[in-house]
Amino acid sequence: MFLNPYIKYVSKNVISRKRIKFLYQGKIVFVRLYNGEVNSVVKPYIMRQFFKKSMFVFLFGGFVYGALEILWRGYTHPSMLLLGGICFLIIYGCEQRQTKYISPLSRAAVYAAFITCLEFIFGLILNIGLGLDIWDYSDLYFNLCGQICLLFSLLWFVLSMLCIYLCKALRFFFEK
């Protein structure tokens, strides 16, 4: 059983005590146990690395989304940091998969639809359900319940194109 890129900087002497074979391929260390199970020393390391990376991506997406909203309308709401983090984390996860067979335009359209759906769900919960009135698109054309509109869906499409290339840059940053 081979494990993927989360095992990078594991020292040889710690793992060799647990009867592990090493197979080096570039900078990434692939680990295989004799019995095919995940090592009790290696598994927590993998989970810590995965959690740190996911938390960084989540916070990065949340703060970038919050900064964009502040630039666009002058203020933001803390729940928008949560929404931005969730959206970027899921987009980053999708971009980690083999996406070379799908065009960037198609991926951006799917991501824009996904972000619009999440914006609608958050709008129903926060604006209509809890009455926070964080945003209101009622005065814009082609809106749905005042929570989403076509104009912002197109804006999400453009920003999704930028996110695709930002995900590539982050992946390069993490692999260094």
List the predicted regions and their residue ranges.
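Aromatic-rich, lipid-facing transmembrane alpha helices and their immediate juxtamembrane interface loops
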Residues: 2-10, 23-176
